[in-house]
Amino acid sequence: MTNYREIAWQGLWKNNPGLVQLLGLCPLLAVTATITNALGLGLATMLVLIGSNILVSLVRDYVPKEIRIPVFVMIIAALVTTVQLLINAYAYGLYLSLGIFLPLIVTNCIIIGRAEAFASRNNAFSAAFDGLMMGLGFTLVLTVLGATREILGQGTLFDGADQLLGPWAKSLTIHLWQVDTPFLLAMLPPGAFIVMGLLIALKNVIDKKVKERQPQVAAEPSVTRARITKVG
């Protein structure tokens, strides 16, 4: 029986693809200059994850093991192309902002990794839930990273939200303080590396504190085996 709580825990925290597995670092560090770009890439990745997991789970019994990886990649590429065309049609500004990193979702190790490790061994519903949780965990990391970099670099939040949600979303932009010159270190990839390292360190500290608060399980006493030789 599938443990959905464990799947959610793995995707959102314990085995988070961004903070623990460190997968998809290239787009994660390059595109997250603003929270809008981070959300756009995260949602696109999550849609592809869910769709690829479902399709891989449905065809797993019909694909020979020898050619499963090329078949999985073709499925992922078809889904990425579909998502790319949808973003191009309905969120053209976001499409331009994400650039080459949108089609590069095909090569994202998170997607092919979940297809091989989970979707190819479980039913469609469980695979879809795994894709949702892994995608949501990745999107949360992207969002926190993008929000932190945008605040430090521009002093704003949700700048350019109209690219993702439409013209009405211009009113969502929050100006936290006036910035005459953007803080380039936060806006460029080196700043993303630093913020990402701090997020990983924060997660490790939280895990350590939680582990210390858990009751210690007493170790079982060791049993010493003695060999008795009967004499006489």
UniProtKB/Swiss-Prot annotation:
Transmembrane regions: 18-38, 39-59, 69-89, 93-113, 127-147, 182-202
Keywords (A to Z) from UniProt: Cell inner membrane, Cell membrane, Electron transport, Membrane, Translocase, Transmembrane, Transmembrane helix, Transport
UniProt-annotated location(s): Cell inner membrane
Pfam families, per the entry: Rnf-Nqr
Entry EC number(s): 7.-.-.-
Membrane topology per record: Multi-pass membrane protein
InterPro entries xref list: NqrDE/RnfAE, RnfE
GO cellular component labels: plasma membrane
Single Gene Ontology BP annotation: electron transport chain
Domain of life of the organism encoding this protein: Bacteria
Function comment: Part of a membrane-bound complex that couples electron transfer with translocation of ions across the membrane.
Subunit and partners: The complex is composed of six subunits: RnfA, RnfB, RnfC, RnfD, RnfE and RnfG.
Family note: Belongs to the NqrDE/RnfAE family.
HAMAP family reported for this sequence: RsxE_RnfE
Name of the featured protein: Ion-translocating oxidoreductase complex subunit E
Organism: Shewanella baltica (strain OS185)
Gene from which the chain derives: rnfE
